[in-house]
């Protein structure tokens, strides 16, 4: 039996609705949030599969979607030496169940997703900022977060302490040409005619 057949059999046995999705060369499934914990538990406890290691958990922001946040779990089976991707989507106002009690490594990953996107995990009451400053305003990986942020942190020599102040850009935004050097730009700059000779 192939790996995807084993997973389909496990999901059917557990009455969990899953949808196979394409993620390059990886086996991946999309699942509704309320099926997430039972599915993770079944994958971990299955003697045939043993997906016991959470190698990564991250969020992605798709602001135009109704359920804008996609939470992605990367699992590893040491028994099969195979990876599995589980995806679930939630809206901005929804929360997602914490996987900490099933996969203990989820704790820090969930804190990171909370810090970067503002996604709440039910069952993980730790709301510490682990990548941003304690007084940081907002969630920086959301697509609606301003490019420059809201405040900047500087050391004030007069006060001899860290000070928060409004963002002050020392340089103006400029237009940059991001075309690769393998593809020449469609415009001609002064002096380009000399290079052709």
UniProtKB/Swiss-Prot annotation:
Pfam families: Complex1_30kDa. Signal peptide: none annotated. GO terms for cellular component: plasma membrane. The gene is nuoC. One of its GO terms (molecular function) is NADH:ubiquinone reductase (non-electrogenic) activity. HAMAP family: NDH1_NuoC (MF_01357). It is an enzyme of class 7 (translocase). Keywords: Cell inner membrane, Cell membrane, Membrane, NAD, Quinone, Translocase, Transport, Ubiquinone. It comes from Rickettsia typhi (strain ATCC VR-144 / Wilmington). It comes from the Bacteria. Its EC number is 7.1.1.-. InterPro entries: NADH_DH_suC (IPR010218), NADH_quin_OxRdtase_su_C/D-like (IPR037232), NADH_UbQ_OxRdtase_30kDa_su (IPR001268). It catalyses: a quinone + NADH + 5 H(+)(in) = a quinol + NAD(+) + 4 H(+)(out). It is found in: Cell inner membrane. The keyword Translocase applies. It is a peripheral membrane protein. NDH-1 is composed of 14 different subunits. Subunits NuoB, C, D, E, F, and G constitute the peripheral sector of the complex. NDH-1 shuttles electrons from NADH, via FMN and iron-sulfur (Fe-S) centers, to quinones in the respiratory chain. The immediate electron acceptor for the enzyme in this species is believed to be ubiquinone. Couples the redox reaction to proton translocation (for every two electrons transferred, four hydrogen ions are translocated across the cytoplasmic membrane), and thus conserves the redox energy in a proton gradient. This is NADH-quinone oxidoreductase subunit C. Belongs to the complex I 30 kDa subunit family.
